[in-house]
Amino acid sequence: MASKCLKASFSSGSLKVPGGAGGGSARVSTIFSSSSCKLPSFSRGPRSFSACSVGLGKSSCRAASCLPALCLPSGGFATSYSMAGGWFGEGILTGNEKETMQFLNDRLASYLEKCGSWSGRTRSWRAASTSGVSNSALPVPDYQSYFQTIEELQKKTLCTKSENARLVVQIDNAKLAADDFRTKYETEVSMRQLVESDMNGLRRILDDLTLCKADLEAQVESLKEELLCLKKNHEEEVNSLRCQLGDRLNVEVDAAPPVDLNRVLNEMRCQYETLVENNRREAEDWFNTQTEELNQQVVSSSEQLQSYQAEIIELRRTVNALEIELQAQHSMRDALESTLAETEARYSSQLAQMQGLIGNVESQLAEIRCDLERQNQEYQVLLDVRARLECEINTYRGLLDSEDCKLPCNPCAPDHSPSKSCLPCLPAASCGPGMARTTCSPRPICVPCPGSRF
């Protein structure tokens, strides 16, 4: 009735073996813990069979209808076989299934033997390695010279890198200085062009003023010629009048004193001369005032032009400074954008890695949950099997007790009363453990426990 158990302590593992008569394959999951073992039953289609013991080099099998499928109720060396089809049917073992059980037991025994031999070899190798290392110390080569050479090369590399960085900084500074000089040259060229354009404008104004001066001088000359012509005409008229008066007779008449023509002519001459002088003076004054006004306008316009040019120069300098600052801001913006893009790319890659890790962890968690559910189902199945096996054990115990009751109490005494079969103590409600039993009473036949399975 008792099954053989193996005392071992190993880690868990799995083994895939061929199936029974119907083909297919079976997965053998082994869990090595303490010193006891239990094996559940196989099931394929309508039949079921159980393996109750596994030993080193030998095995024993019996049908599920005859013996329980587990050796011990808890702990130990457990081997579970899961195949296609339902769990725990009724039937007997066939020849192929017995061969499969024999094959599995042989394989398991060989595996345990190999594990033991490998553990012994490992211990022996460790002992040999520790003893060899302690006995003979290997010579350690001297790498100090190589280290010194490496340090010198590293120092040279650092010096070269610093020199390269300094040269790069100098090149950048030279480029910036060249850009500044280029901008200054462009500003000076633009200023020279503006000054040349202003000079051309002033030349035009000077030419216009020169033309005006020439016109005024021509007008003065024409006025002088006109004055000379008037003087000449006046002299001719005076001479003609004198000639006319000289040819006449002098007649003295007692009358009012005559008018002195010479005096009148002299007065007229003086009047005309004063009038001409006034006209000349007025023309000169007008010319001088116009010239002074023009000179003042030229001076004021030149001063305004200089002030405007100074303002233009200052504005251009401000514009150049603002352009340089704008270029610096653009370069800073480009650098910040590149840094932002690099940061986004780095964090996106890190985020992708984190998401991948999260996905892996979630998949592992899902697998763990599936394993937990599967183990829970297996545990429930094993609990069901345990309950059924305890029920069968109680049934077998009742049968054995009934067989014991059938035997006579005193076999040597003569039988004077009719024999009655003695039934086993039946449980009050069910065949579960811990239930109360009824007293033995003679019955004509032995009845199994209700709810038991054969």
From Swiss-Prot:
Organism, by scientific name, is: Bos taurus (Bovine)
* Protein name from the UniProt record: Keratin, type I cuticular Ha5
Annotated region (Coil 1A) at: 98-125
Ranges where the record places region Tail: 404-454
Any signal peptide, and if so, which residues? none
Additional notes on this entry: There are two types of hair/microfibrillar keratin, I (acidic) and II (neutral to basic).
Gene encoding this chain?
KRT35
Query: Any idea which UniProt keywords this protein has?
Result: Coiled coil, Intermediate filament, Keratin
The UniProt similarity line reads: Belongs to the intermediate filament family.
Where are the stretches annotated Linker 12? 244-259
Q: Name one GO biological process term.
A: epithelial cell differentiation
Report domain IF rod positions.
97-407
What are the GO MF terms of this UniProt record?
A: structural molecule activity
Top-level taxon in the UniProt lineage: Eukaryota
Q: Spell out the GO cellular component terms annotated for this protein, sorted alphabetically and separated by semicolons.
A: cytoskeleton; intermediate filament
InterPro entries recorded:
IF_conserved, IF_rod_dom, Keratin_I
The feature of type site (Stutter) is located at: 345
Q: Where are the transmembrane segments?
A: none
In residue numbers, the region (Coil 2) covers: 260-403
SUPFAM superfamilies for this protein: Intermediate filament protein, coiled coil region, Prefoldin
**Region called Head, residue ranges:** 1-97
Annotated region Coil 1B: the residues are: 143-243
